[in-house]
Amino acid sequence: MIGSLCKNEAATKDVLRSVKAMGYDEIELNGFMTHPTSFFVRMLTKLAGMPTGKAGKYDWKKLVRDAGLGVTSIHFDLGTLERDLTACIQEAKDYPTSRIVVTGMYRFDYSDLKALEELSARLNKVGEQLAQSGIELLYHNHNVEFKRVGEKNQFAYEILMERLNPDWVNFEFDSYWAAE
């Protein structure tokens, strides 16, 4: 994750130029990197192995543009999308990208079938609204979606695949977390 290398703005510029020099044309941005976060959130992400430092204070649109990179997608948490969808759509278009990613949520109970059904409904609703604005919603897994659920003993990920409408929500499969 490049965020761990972005110790300060100068280092971030160097990292982005190096990414471009390696032949990449686009990067994916995470909301922890692109928005100021509280000390508590920075500590949690650091403990999870995803340190972000003070990257939320940088002008990422300018940094990415100056490095000659594009943005393939940007992450938002589901709560932010539900609370302020218009601002999220505008931010995606400002980068510009046509993809928004929601990640698996650690405070969510993936072993509860009813909760998974409710999560699917929420994701479908946001995905439908984003689709109307020309933006695709992607669901990015972590290891928590690989808990067994219900009488069929399915993975939570399988239940999400069954319940999410592919016209509104697609998947960004992270094999690292699936193998963990």
What residue spans do the PLM features occupy?
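Repeat-unit-sized solenoid/scaffold elements
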Residues: G70, C88, A92-E117, V169-E180
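Catalytic-core regions built around general acid/base machinery
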Residues: K54-D66, R122-Q132, I159
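Charged helix-capping and loop-helix junction motifs
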Residues: K13, T52-K57, L85-T86, A115-L123, ...
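A short acidic, helix-capping loop that chelates divalent metal ions and anchors anionic groups
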Residues: H35-F40, F108-L113, F146-R148
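Acidic/histidine-rich catalytic cores of soluble enzymes
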Residues: I27, E128-E180
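Active-site beta-loop-alpha junctions enriched in small/polar residues
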Residues: M1-L5, N30-T34, F76-G79, M105-R107, ...
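An active-site-proximal structural segment forming one wall of the substrate-binding cleft
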Residues: L81-T103, A115-S133, E162-L164
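N-terminal pre-domain/capping segments
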Residues: M1-R99, N170
